[in-house]
Amino acid sequence: MGCSVLLLTITVSTLGGLVFGYELGIISGALPQLQTHFSLGCVQQEAVVSALLIGSLFASIIGGWLIDRHGRRTSILLSNLLILAGSVILTTGTSFFALVIGRAVIGFAMTVSSMSCCIFVSEMVTPERRGLMVTLYEVGITVGILIAYAVNYIFNNVPLTGWRYMFGFAIIPSLIQLASIVLLPKQAEVFVIHDDDSRQADRLTEETETSNQHQQSEKYGVSDLFKSKDNMRRRTVIGVGLVLSQQFTGQPNVLFYASTILFSVGFQSNASAILASVGFGIVKVIATLLAMLCSDRAGRRSLLIGGCSMLAVGLILTGFLCRQSVIDTTKRCTSVGPHSNLTLSAEHDEGVGFSSQTLDVHEHLRSFSQSEDIYKWIIFTCLMAVVSAFSVSFGPMTWVVLSEIFPKDIRGRAFSFINCFNVGANLIVSFSFLSIIDVIGLSGVFLMYGVVGIAGVVFIYLVLPETKGKSLQDIDRELSQTRMIHRQELCSIFQRRRFSPGYQRVQLTSTAT
């Protein structure tokens, strides 16, 4: 019984991640067609992209209450039905307003599903498997993104209706997930999957009893997230800091505007830009699988620090390379045609303005075409490194940590509260991306993201404890009793250096003989 419930749980969670990733990635290829079909301007394009996040923000506000009140399974079921409804609205939509409504409905459903699946799986498995199983959700997301990019490429050349097929394809995995949810027992949340080893089973039983006693004697409200009680304020700081670092390193824009970014750095057709974005999807899948295998070995903290460091380096290199390349342009959004504002060919140079170049475009492109081609592939390689670093670190590990650091009876509401910051930051980053490029150029945007990545490394080192191999009760107990250990260690190092005796000049005197 336990194994069958576990398999169904994994199936539901992974399919939820797949649909989540698909909806994140599909807009990248659909946006150029939507821009042409509906004559969308810059703000309208950003609105279609960000409508997903507006729905997600609303879900973050009420989703925690929904999960804690009605259970994880019911929440997943509701989100699945809403995704089906949103997909139908998008597939049959005939106006800009319908696109925004459909994307908002799907955004609400995706967020409820994301929170429910991560919490559900974390409560179902043993500590030794928790990192692996929760990371499976992120694997589903990356596979969904890869499928979305592939579908974008397939339907890119379908005139007029290609974007409808792109949005409608999400119905297939949603129906499969719906069937899996129906088969999942209603009381699956009360099952705990035991290891074959009897001592492990006994330990889990004891921890379950301890957890029940703890819930009876200790109840939390949302206001407790801001109090020093059981170090809840510290846990909230950890969660908020992780999601803000995750979003302000610009990863959402690499997903939402992948084709736009690749087009702007030299992939001079929609098809080539979309095909190159498939490479992002492949790298994300491979890197996430690596994180899944290493999360319970290397640990959450190590993967976050290492991945975020690599992320920062990749972003800064991309920024400098864009600045050196003649491709570093400021954008002027138009609704003439897909990516017409980014075209670098000599035939369409009238709409392109260079942020720091005043040379004639025709002569410049003829003189440096080979150099541009080299820059294009180096930048593409750096972006691949950025995508893989994110997929090893922030992508899966943020949600693993968030599912572990809060007590069970407030976990849903805490997850929801933290996700409000996650979605809010995502909304700011995504909605302002094209406008910021107009002001500081593509290189400035990536350099800014790189600085945030460096700050993220420092934050993780100072405040995040390692949680690998620990039960949820052990993590709760440790966080309730300890402060920011790594910050104290760092301060002690500086204090030792400050008060330790420095070098002293020794004067040697010679005595006359």
Curated annotation (Swiss-Prot):
* Disruption-associated phenotype: Morpholino knockdown of the protein causes notochord and cardiovascular abnormalities. Fishes display a reduced heart rate and blood flow, coupled with an incomplete and irregular vascular patterning.
Q: Which intervals lie on the Extracellular side per UniProt?
A: 28-46, 102-104, 152-164, 258-272, 323-376
Q: Which residues bind D-glucose?
A: 246-247, 399
Q: Tell me which UniProt keywords the record has, alphabetically.
A: Cytoplasm, Glycoprotein, Membrane, Sugar transport, Transmembrane, Transmembrane helix, Transport
What membrane topology is given?
Multi-pass membrane protein
Return any one Pfam family short name: Sugar_tr
User: What SUPFAM superfamilies does its record include?
Assistant: MFS general substrate transporter
State the compartments where it is located: Endomembrane system; Cytoplasm, Perinuclear region
**UniProt xrefs under CDD domains:** MFS_GLUT10_Class3 (cd17436)
Question: What GO CC annotations are associated with the protein?
Answer: endomembrane system; membrane; perinuclear region of cytoplasm
Instruction: Recall the GO molecular function terms of this protein's record.
Output: D-glucose transmembrane transporter activity
The regions listed as transmembrane in this protein's record are 7-27, 47-67, 81-101, 105-125, 131-151, 165-185, 237-257, 273-293, 302-322, 377-397, 423-443, 444-464
* GO terms classed as biological process: circulatory system development; D-glucose transmembrane transport; notochord development
Please verify whether the record's keywords include Lyase: no
What is the reaction catalyzed? D-glucose(out) = D-glucose(in)
InterPro entries linked to this entry: MFS_dom (IPR020846), MFS_sugar_transport-like (IPR005828), MFS_Sugar_Transporter (IPR050820), MFS_trans_sf (IPR036259), Sugar/inositol_transpt (IPR003663), Sugar_transporter_CS (IPR005829)
* Family, similarity comment: Belongs to the major facilitator superfamily. Sugar transporter (TC 2.A.1.1) family. Glucose transporter subfamily.
Matches recorded under PANTHER family: D-XYLOSE-PROTON SYMPORTER-LIKE 2, SOLUTE CARRIER FAMILY 2, FACILITATED GLUCOSE TRANSPORTER MEMBER 10
Q: What is this protein called?
A: Solute carrier family 2, facilitated glucose transporter member 10
Name the lineage: Eukaryota, Metazoa, Chordata, Craniata, Vertebrata
